[in-house]
């Protein structure tokens, strides 16, 4: 399964558009407990613990996106976009793109 942020895949011809695919993951964030309790994880203003959670969430929803595209009969997803939104103590990670068949 080819995944790309571009609207085309160089050297490949798009044969069919299968539609928009999207996936989301919600991560609970308790700033007082998680951030302040893990001050040792913060290096240069970055939290290794939260970065790991974000990476895991992003990888999980990408795999789910690929599965959704496969279920539509696609072999690639083009125009991938990510969004990160904070709402109260939750972080929403979203990904979407267009499922296509390429040759």
From Swiss-Prot:
Domain of life: Bacteria
Protein name per the record: UPF0145 protein PERMA_0324
Coiled-coil ranges from the UniProt annotation: none
InterPro entries the record matches: UPF0145_dom_sf, UPF0145_YbjQ-like
Annotated family: Belongs to the UPF0145 family.
């Amino acid at each position: 399964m080819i995944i790309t942020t571009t609207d085309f895949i160089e050297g490949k011809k798009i044969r069919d558009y299968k539609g928009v695919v999207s996936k989301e993951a919600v991560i609970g964030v308790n700033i007082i407990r998680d951030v302040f309790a893990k001050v040792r994880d913060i290096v240069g203003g970055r939290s290794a613990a939260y970065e790991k959670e974000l990476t895991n969430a992003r990888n999980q929803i990408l795999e789910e996106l690929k599965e959704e595209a496969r279920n539509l009969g696609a072999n690639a997803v083009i125009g991938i976009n990510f969004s990160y939104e904070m709402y109260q103590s939750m972080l929403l990670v979203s990904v979407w793109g267009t499922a296509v068949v390429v040759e």
